[in-house]
């Protein structure tokens, strides 16, 4: 019988899913294919990965408040799709805090986990798109890095087709977002800039693949470490884990993603979908995470509701090859070559723990440096582990930037931590709470944090700027973007 705390976690997850569509009637406020910024110029395919095709300065919109970063830019850049031989393009958003360190860059990976164009990080920062509550959470955890003075680059790592679950593509696009950011002369980044990455859940798909592909695809990048948790390292394993659960809509989103970028998968899927299946994929292409989950809970991909082959729907050589290609850790040459910090709840209800643990073990056998923390308490789930693990993940990256050596080899440890027990969290408690409360408004920079009361103005920054913190209803008004568009 579930405990009261287990029921509380379930109620909390459902509350978040139900709450944000109510906030986010701005979810219908789509980016729009007619936005000229997202259209690449002629001959873009002849450019090199990481080459900037276009850029603009933006006034970033933040869902929970106005964070007074010093500058923000968006870059359209050349990248790759499923292989290095398939040209593609996408966008990254750069956030520059006050007194930014010009020799440090952090790539932040958002758990978009959906296929609608309004769900991308760039749409969130440009249009204040509130339709993806996970973006709201990730935005909050990025505060720790910005507060430290780290410049952040946050790619639309699902590409223009918003191909959720196409992990290799996400890895290429993330590595090329780093290249593009380093190429952006306005930042004046040092030639020896050190780089790290942070992400969770869908963001860990991205960084798991970026860390795996970096040695062969982008060996020149001075990446010093990665932190990611709740890692969906095996696509088929994740599908089987959430099939028939309240999170089963994620399966349709993932099928939509790989269908839209793998032509051979698209060809097969079209032969097995029924009308409800085609409708489901089209719904996913136009909506964000919580809308998809609320539309398709407790569904089984192996039933005949969406397709005509039942439990044999994935019993196809092409599909099986794709699942193999999208499993981390099975190819020795795709092993991270810098330290990695991973964390995962043993009882994760969305992403299977065993798959992530197996990937970490495989990487270790091939010479990686992996520090893996298991949160074993039976009350620790996917969302609570994201919060609890965010501070150790940040400390791991900060220690690397501060020159702390990471011991050779791998280290697997278990913590019987319960998030709501402050004595267990110890010193982490205030930092976690501050990071979450920070969403209500603060000046971002290493000189110190100022939490602003709602509807107040805090003045006196070095740059002469001020921080306005709005009430919730004020923050969620759509404001015309003030941006400068330049061709590279």
Curated annotation (Swiss-Prot):
The keyword Disulfide bond applies. Inhibited by different metal ions including Fe(2+), Fe(3+), Cu(2+), and Zn(2+). The monovalent ions Na(+) and K(+) exhibit less dramatic inhibition. It is found in: Secreted. The active site is at residues 201, 348, 382. Optimum pH is 5.8. Residues 461-488 are annotated as: Disordered. InterPro entries: AB_hydrolase_fold (IPR029058), Lipase_secreted (IPR005152). Its EC number is 3.1.1.-, 3.1.1.3. Its main location: secreted. Residues 1-26 form the signal peptide. Residues 469-480 have a biased composition (Basic residues). It comes from the Eukaryota. Keywords: Disulfide bond, Glycoprotein, Hydrolase, Lipid degradation, Lipid metabolism, Secreted, Signal, Virulence. Optimum temperature is 40 degrees Celsius. One of its GO terms (molecular function) is triacylglycerol lipase activity. It is an enzyme of class 3 (hydrolase). Glycans are attached at residues 183, 316. One of its GO terms (biological process) is lipid catabolic process. Gene3D superfamilies: 1.10.260.130, alpha/beta hydrolase. Induction: Not expressed in laboratory conditions. Belongs to the AB hydrolase superfamily. Lipase family. Class Lip subfamily. This is Secreted triacylglycerol lipase LIP1. The lineage of its organism: Eukaryota, Fungi, Dikarya, Basidiomycota, Ustilaginomycotina. The gene is LIP1.
């Amino acid at each position: 019988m579930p405990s009261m705390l287990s029921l509380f976690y379930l109620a909390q997850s459902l509350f978040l899913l139900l709450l944000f569509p109510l906030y986010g009637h701005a979810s219908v406020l789509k980016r729009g294919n007619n936005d000229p910024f997202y259209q690449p110029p002629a001959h873009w395919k002849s450019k090199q990965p990481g080459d900037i095709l276009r850029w603009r300065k933006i006034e970033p919109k933040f869902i929970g408040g106005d964070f007074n970063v010093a500058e923000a830019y968006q870059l359209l850049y050349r990248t790759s799709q499923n292989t290095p031989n398939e040209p593609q393009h996408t966008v990254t958003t750069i956030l520059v805090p006050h007194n930014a360190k010009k020799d440090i860059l952090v790539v932040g990976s958002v758990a978009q986990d959906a296929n609608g164009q309004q769900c991308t990080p760039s749409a969130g920062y440009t249009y204040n798109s509130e339709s993806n509550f996970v973006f709201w959470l990730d935005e909050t955890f990025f505060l720790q890095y910005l507060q430290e003075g780290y410049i952040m680059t946050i790619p639309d790592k699902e590409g223009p087709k918003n191909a959720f679950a196409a992990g290799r593509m996400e890895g290429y696009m993330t590595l090329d977002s780093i290249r593009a950011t380093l190429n952006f002369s306005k930042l004046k980044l040092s030639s020896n800039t050190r780089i790290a990455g942070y992400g969770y859940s869908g963001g860990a798909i991205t960084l798991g693949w970026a860390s795996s592909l970096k040695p062969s695809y982008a060996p020149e990048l001075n990446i010093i470490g990665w932190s990611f948790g709740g890692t969906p390292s095996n696509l088929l394993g994740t599908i089987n884990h959430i099939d028939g659960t309240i999170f089963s809509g994620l399966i349709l989103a993932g099928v939509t993603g790989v269908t839209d970028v793998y032509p051979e998968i698209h060809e097969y899927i079209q032969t097995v979908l029924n009308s409800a299946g085609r409708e489901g994929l089209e719904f996913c292409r136009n909506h964000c995470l919580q809308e998809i989950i609320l539309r398709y809970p407790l569904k089984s991909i192996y039933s005949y509701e969406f397709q005509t082959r039942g439990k044999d729907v994935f019993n196809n050589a092409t599909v099986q090859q794709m699942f193999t290609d999208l499993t981390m850790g099975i190819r020795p040459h795709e092993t991270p070559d810098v330290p990695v910090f991973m964390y995962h709840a043993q009882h994760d209800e969305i992403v299977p723990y065993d798959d992530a643990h197996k990937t970490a073990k495989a990487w270790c056998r091939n010479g990686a440096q992996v520090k893996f923390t298991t949160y074993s308490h039976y009350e620790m789930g996917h969302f609570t582990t994201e919060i609890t693990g965010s501070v150790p993940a940040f400390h791991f990256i900060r220690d690397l930037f501060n020159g702390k050596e990471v011991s050779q080899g791998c280290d697997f440890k278990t913590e019987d931590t319960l998030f709501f027990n402050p004595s267990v969290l110890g010193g982490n408690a205030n930092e976690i709470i501050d990071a979450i409360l920070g969403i209500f408004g603060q000046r971002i920079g290493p000189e110190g944090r100022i939490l602003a009361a709602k509807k107040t103005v805090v003045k006196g920054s070095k740059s002469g700027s001020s921080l306005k913190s709005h009430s919730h209803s004020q923050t969620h008004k759509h404001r015309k973007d003030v941006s400068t568009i330049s061709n590279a």
